[in-house]
Regions:
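N-terminal small-domain helix-loop-helix segment of the aminotransferase-like
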Residues: 26-29, 38-137, 188, 343-350, ...
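Conserved core segment of the aminotransferase class I/II
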Residues: 28, 268-358
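Conserved core of the PLP fold type I
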Residues: 95-234, 239, 245-268, 273
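PLP-dependent enzyme catalytic core of the Aspartate aminotransferase-like
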Residues: 114, 118, 122-125, 268, ...
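Short hydrophobic/aromatic beta-strand micro-patches
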Residues: 293, 395-397, 433-435
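Conserved glycine-rich beta-strand-loop-beta hairpin in the small C-terminal domain of fold type I
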Residues: 333-336, 340, 353-368, 378-397
Length: 459
């Protein structure tokens, strides 16, 4: 039989041997294009995380095939019971009728300070540990604050790739931003590139995440030292997003008050603000609760523009009584009790959130191999001389497909992701989140679909 007829026949037979859903895939391109037009999405490569999920759910409904939702970082583990019980008790005591203290409840502030000492070996006074409505509000409010400190210094520098919504926040606020992709600037190359951006004198704050969303690399101690020293030299604030604290599963992190500790910028400069979320550490995302930890030195520092904007000169006071007050009037009262108790239990060694979160590494290891076995490659693959840790996210590319092209093709095969272009990355690929791979049969579906994708897109 002629080879040109044999290949389609083999592909058809392969589909028959796989799950019934495979017969419904890939989604017809006209159906897919029509849906994008209906949703007013002109370019799939710029679709937000929520838009990607909405596209997948609409196609899921139309096709009847179960989609694999690899696009959104929803916790895939149950919320910590100790937090639920503490919040229920707080609600039963009547806190729902009371506005929360803008500074945060005393117990939360004290336990946040203690938790930072236990897991980062960092001393931050309870005064500077301030609850926010998730880290999303934390970044939004700190961007605004940092842009109002010094005349002419109003730009946020993103060390990319990063969380796409944070860049959207600067656009909404009308704050200028700058960025560079760390892909080509790891190790000794980081300092010169970072200094090139700082030399202009307009950078108000630097933001990054470590472990990184989306690539899951971890900045090394040397890289953190470089950032810290340059932040001090150029008097710039570093906003460190530790949403995935202690989740570098290559290291024995997570033993309270014992080394090794979570690497942090706080060891190398006083100009830091740490964002610490309950969403992933404790799977408490629905209650929207986080901590902004402002260094003692920074909290008490006075800035020339603050009285102009907020009628007060001290950074910490302006943050609490002007910025946060204006955007939320305090974080949810009962959720503060939940977070306080989870932080206490973790610092006391009663709640091992790191071992619980290691489930994500197991899912990543299994699914990552499936991608690699079917011709994909890991985009951000190395931390210095060792492979990146397995964890909540990883990044994959396929041949020379652009980020948008790969995202579009994967979604037609029932796999929703987000394009790396939305994260500030200059590399081609997509972000994969493993949190919603909750059932063993989903891994079977993933393997089937990747095999089909590879058969339809030969290398």
């Amino acid at each position: 039989m002629d080879g040109c007829f044999l290949a389609p026949l083999l592909l058809y037979l392969m589909r028959l041997l796989l799950s019934p859903d495979i017969m419904k895939l890939p989604i017809d391109r006209q159906v897919y294009d029509s849906l994008l037009e209906q949703m007013d999405i002109l370019d799939i490569s710029s679709a937000t995380i929520r838009q990607s999920g909405a596209i997948a759910k609409a196609l899921e409904t139309q096709s009847g095939a179960e989609f694999l939702h690899l696009e959104m970082g929803i916790p895939g583990l149950p919320p910590m019971r100790v937090g639920i019980e503490a919040e229920k008790q707080a609600l039963d005591s009547g806190v729902a009728s009371q506005y929360p203290n803008m500074y945060g409840i005393p117990k939360l502030k004290e336990q946040a300070s203690r938790f930072l000492k236990a897991y980062l070996d960092v001393d931050v006074a309870p005064l500077g540990c301030i609850p926010t409505v998730g880290s999303m509000q934390g970044s939004f409010s700190t961007f605004l604050l940092c842009s109002h400190l010094v005349e002419g210094r109003d730009t946020i520098l993103f060390i990319d790739p990063g969380f796409p919504v944070q860049r959207t926040q600067t656009k909404i606020l009308g704050i200028p931003s700058d960025s560079f992709d760390i892909y080509d600037f790891r190790g000794d190359k980081l300092g010169p590139e970072l200094e090139r951006h700082l030399q202009g004198g307009r950078i108000a704050a630097i933001i990054y995440s470590s472990p990184n969303n989306p690539a899951w690399f971890n900045l090394t101690e040397d890289e953190l030292r470089t950032i810290g020293e340059l932040a001090t030299k150029y008097d710039t604030i570093v906003i460190e997003d530790l949403a995935y604290m202690c989740m570098d599963f290559r290291k024995p992190l997570g033993k309270p008050f014992e080394p090794p500790f979570q690497p942090t910028i706080a060891q190398y400069t006083d100009n830091y603000i740490i964002m610490m979320s309950g969403s992933k550490m404790f799977s408490y995302a629905g209650q929207r609760i986080a901590i902004i930890a402002i260094s003692d030195a920074l909290y008490h520092r006075e800035y020339p523009l603050l009285p102009v904007w907020y009628k007060m000169s001290r950074l910490g006071d302006a943050y609490v009584f002007a910025v946060l007050y204006a955007v939320s009037s305090g974080a949810t009262h009962s959720a503060q009790y939940a977070l306080a108790e989870m932080l206490r239990a973790a610092a006391d060694g009663e709640l091992d959130f790191v071992t619980s979160a290691a489930e994500y590494a197991r899912r990543a290891k299994i699914s990552k191999k499936m991608f690699l076995d079917n011709g994909f490659h890991i985009v951000y693959s190395m931390d210095g001389d060792e492979p990146v840790s397995d964890g909540f996210f990883y990044t994959v590319g396929y041949k020379d497909l652009s980020s948008g092209e790969l995202m579009a093709e994967l979604i037609r095969y029932g796999m929703a992701t987000i394009a790396l272009s939305t994260t500030g990355s200059r590399q081609n690929g997509v972000r994969v989140c493993v949190s919603q791979l909750n059932r063993p049969e989903q891994f079977d579906l993933l393997e089937e679909r990747l095999r089909l994708f590879a058969a339809d897109h030969p290398l």
